Amino acid sequence: MADIYAENGASAISVLTDEKFFMGNLETLRELCFTRRSNLPLLRKDFIIHEAQLYESRASGADAILLIAAALLDDEHLADLHALAIELGLTPLVEVHNAVETERALQLKDIHLIGINNRDLTTFDVSLRTTEQLRPMIPPEITIVAESGIYTAGDVERLARVSVDAILVGEALITAPDIALKVRELSGLNVETL
């Protein structure tokens, strides 16, 4: 699957490693690290809440990790994990869902990458308006990744209009009858596919 993504325009590969909620596993990340044909960066997508998970991510071949602000309620803990990730050579993607979390992310030292998740964690409703509303809060020098609810080229165009730099797509690719075609559709515009 990773090779299909790489051959059709993806700029990175997101690997679900959370077992409890998403039926992923760390072994998939390890295997991809050693078997993929491309050199695309690998993002470990998990609920990272402990320093040991960062060391584990690095040892397993991850280039980047997801830090979900909603799962890390203590600002100091979020800052410590963010700093350690950078120290270990991992790129932290700090995921936000609302204005409060966005403000928390902006307080981090050396913040370069923020993911705006369009899924409401309380209702699980998805709306691209989340990205449209939060994007203006974030300085242009910070790379913005829109996450969730991205299914069509029209969605990508809509996000490009608010200066989103990249998109993280999962469900639309996994459920597509032709994954290669869907990757090309979503990556053929002014926004990179992650």
Regions found by a protein language model. Give the residues of each.
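Glycine-rich active-site/cofactor-binding loop and its immediate structural neighborhood
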Residues: M1-K45, H50-E51, E56
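Glycine-rich phosphate-binding active-site loops on the catalytic face of alpha/beta enzymes
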Residues: S11, V15, A59-L73, G115-T123, ...
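Conserved anion-binding
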Residues: R37-D125, P140
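Catalytic cores of alpha/beta
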Residues: I49-G61, A99-K109, A146, I150-V169, ...
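Catalytic-face loop-and-helix region of soluble metabolic enzyme cores
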Residues: H112-V169
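C-terminal helical cap(s) of enzyme catalytic domains, especially alpha/beta-barrels
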Residues: L128, Q133-M137, A160, L173-L194
